[in-house]
């Protein structure tokens, strides 16, 4: 038996990959734990866009995530990503193009008619995708439960795979928190079919369609371990950026706000680590939905080999 601690994206992907490999697994949800920060994610599968600031390993290995998610959950939308900048920030768009790959220049209105005439040009990353994080995590959980995987509180009975995110910081000395803040809005006045990233020198943002006029707007990146509600500054910056994309966002209803602490190692690269008999899958930073399946697959291969040698 393998006991996976935590039911966020890292834990559910790990449990799924271990179960796929035919290994006995259970998921331990710590009593009184807050909801996984994964549910606040953008749910963008955007390895090429991440190349603007992320190490090459995120770009190359993250490409495998799209096929993994499509094989395991419904609702993966392969419509690509559109990257824009206000006219005064046109240099940022050129810089983004130089720092990334697998894109082409487009007239934004040709892809998103609601943006016609608002931006002269944009970058289109056609091989990227997005999904609703809450729905995806719910689908993984449901599949595991159908397979007979137990979700429970209490003491683990098997080999421990620790996927508790920032809650594991006492055992991982170099794990730090990066605070993220997001909004969810609804408006019938804007129709977007794919994630739109707006570049900005101080507060870049992304807008992810959730269907039925709902949009997730995120996400701030603050080097802080402070919990608590969203700040007024974050709300103003995110809504200001959304307004730049389309003025109708000014009339949108804010239906939810969220904050979370992203678990991050110094190099911001998610990793599998060993501490005695305990295996940690952590450090997801802003790459949870992109890298959790990759590490989960690696974990399942590693544990399959080890258990085979143990017999």
Task: Tell where the protein language model's regions lie, with residue ranges.
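N-terminal Rossmann-like FAD-binding beta1-loop-alpha1 element of flavoenzymes
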Residues: 2-26
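Short hydrophobic core segments
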Residues: 5, 156-166, 296
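Active-site substrate-recognition segment that forms the wall
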Residues: 16-17, 21, 39, 75-76, ...
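Glycine-rich FAD pyrophosphate-binding loop
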Residues: 20-38
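Dinucleotide-binding Rossmann-like beta1-alpha1 core, especially the glycine-rich loop
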Residues: 43-113
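Short beta-strand to alpha-helix junction loop
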Residues: 53-64, 123-139, 229-234, 291
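Helical element adjacent to the flavin cofactor pocket in flavoenzyme catalytic cores
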Residues: 123-155, 159, 163
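C-terminal catalytic lobe of FAD-dependent flavoproteins
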Residues: 253-311
């Amino acid at each position: 038996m393998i006991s996976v601690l935590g039911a966020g994206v890292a834990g559910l992907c790990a449990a799924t990959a271990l179960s796929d490999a035919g290994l006995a697994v259970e998921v331990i949800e710590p009593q009184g734990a807050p909801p996984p920060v994964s549910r606040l994610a953008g749910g963008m599968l955007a390895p090429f866009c991440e190349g603007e600031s992320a190490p090459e390993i995120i770009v190359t290995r993250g490409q495998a995530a799209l096929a993994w998610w499509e094989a395991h959950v419904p609702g993966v939308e392969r419509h690509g990503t559109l990257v824009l900048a206000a006219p005064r920030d046109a240099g940022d768009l050129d810089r983004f193009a130089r720092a990334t790959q697998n894109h082409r220049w487009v007239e934004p209105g040709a892809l998103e008619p609601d943006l016609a005439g608002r931006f002269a040009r944009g970058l289109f990353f056609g091989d990227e995708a997005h999904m609703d994080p809450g729905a995806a995590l719910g689908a993984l959980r449901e599949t595991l439960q159908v397979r007979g995987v137990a979700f429970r509180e209490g003491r683990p009975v098997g080999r421990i795979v620790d996927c508790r995110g920032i809650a594991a910081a006492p055992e991982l000395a170099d794990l730090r928190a990066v605070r993220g803040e997001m909004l969810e809005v609804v408006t019938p006045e804007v129709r977007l079919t794919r994630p739109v990233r707006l570049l900005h020198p101080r507060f870049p943002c992304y807008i992810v369609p959730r269907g039925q006029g709902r949009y997730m707007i995120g996400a701030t990146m603050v080097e802080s371990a402070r919990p608590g509600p969203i700040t007024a500054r974050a709300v103003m910056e995110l809504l200001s950026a959304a307004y730049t994309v389309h003025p109708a966002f000014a009339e949108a209803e804010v239906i939810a706000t969220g904050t979370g602490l992203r678990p991050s190692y110094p190099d911001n690269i998610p990793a599998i680590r060993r501490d005695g008999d305990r295996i940690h899958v952590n450090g997801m930073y802003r790459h949870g939905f992109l890298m959790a399946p990759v590490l989960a697959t690696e974990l399942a291969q590693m544990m399959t080999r080890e258990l085979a040698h143990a017999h």
